[in-house]
Amino acid sequence: MSLKEKTQSLFANAFGYPATHTIQAPGRVNLIGEHTDYNDGFVLPCAIDYQTVISCAPRDDRKVRVMAADYENQLDEFSLNAPIVAHENYQWANYVRGVVKHLQLRNNSFGGVDMVISGNVPQGAGLSSSASLEVAVGTVLQQLYHLPLDGAQIALNGQEAENQFVGCNCGIMDQLISALGKKDHSLLIDCRSLGTKAVSMPKGVAVVIINSNFKRTLVGSEYNTRREQCETGARFFQQPALRDVTIEEFNAVAHELDPIVAKRVRHILTENARTVEAASALEQGDLKRMGELMAESHASMRDDFEITVPQIDTLVEIVKAVIGDKGGVRMTGGGFGGCIVALIPEELVPAVQQAVAEQYEAKIGIKETFYVCKPSQGAGQC
């Protein structure tokens, strides 16, 4: 049963009438451009065919009822007439409440709604299950009540809800790609202007995500440290962000910087350049060059930004040994565990899967999870 069929059937059973709309919003993977977002730089994600699906209908009062199919059909209910506050017990409900509250704060006028939510974006894998939920809820209200919001505004509203209501500091990339993703394309995003450019993906190439299943522990504290080091670097160059520093300017004075800060800055500057070049390589179908750029990105994250772990490096090496120069592989996400992403010719996917199955657990003692994805369409009706 598809997520659409599941949520529609649950909706009818729970609320006693059929849903009028079914909306989806996808998760995402970032192909290249790591830790560049908060430096006002470039990222190159694509939406994936794992999504959050919501069957819904407008109500003629001011009540919101939400059922979470993936959490034992837990039901949350609140009124649009009262101040929206956090739910004491259901963390999932706070993503919904936060999005609704922030849409209200943006002076949008809408009535009540019934929703049933289900999703298959793996949680805790760094594939943006929370952003896909936020964008799906925003799109539900936009569609049901014809709100004058475009995808970028729905994305910004989701980011605001996550930062201010849920209390998790995130950049804009995850929500933006979920809202604006395009089938068979990745999206080059300028994190300063929020300008986007759709980049066609080469035919016959699979987007493979492999979760190391190594639980990230340092990610919060180390993420903040990296952010501070980047800000220190930008101040040294008297610029608002590292986006504004050229590699030539850096090379001329690198020796004057604290050595650790210098390494962090070098990663950001080279990663930004790689990301822009990667968009061109993909557009030209140059998988060999894309693979080189992904390898350079991984080495930079490992040696200059120091955010990889042995489990991740091992996974990358296993995949690289199979694909050679026929594709690319690197760590993706915040670091210290999580996932790797690979662009692989479809005919090589079984060999990669077999090599990883035979070698990773034997070397590391943890079983990986393997996802084969297609670059998918952003949020909308399904």
Swiss-Prot record:
Pfam (any one): GalKase_gal_bdg
GO cellular component terms, A-Z: cytosol
Transmembrane segments: none
Top EC class of this enzyme: transferase
Active site: 174
Gene Ontology biological-process entries: galactose metabolic process
SUPFAM superfamilies: GHMP Kinase, C-terminal domain (SSF55060), Ribosomal protein S5 domain 2-like (SSF54211)
Pathway: Carbohydrate metabolism; galactose metabolism
GO MF annotation: an example: ATP binding
Catalytic activity, reaction form: alpha-D-galactose + ATP = alpha-D-galactose 1-phosphate + ADP + H(+)
Highest rank taxon of the organism: Bacteria
Record-annotated site: Transition state stabilizer: 28
PROSITE patterns: GALACTOKINASE, GHMP_KINASES_ATP
Keyword tRNA processing: no
Similarity comment: Belongs to the GHMP kinase family. GalK subfamily.
Function statement: Catalyzes the transfer of the gamma-phosphate of ATP to D-galactose to form alpha-D-galactose-1-phosphate (Gal-1-P).
The protein's name: Galactokinase
Organism: Shigella boydii serotype 18 (strain CDC 3083-94 / BS512)
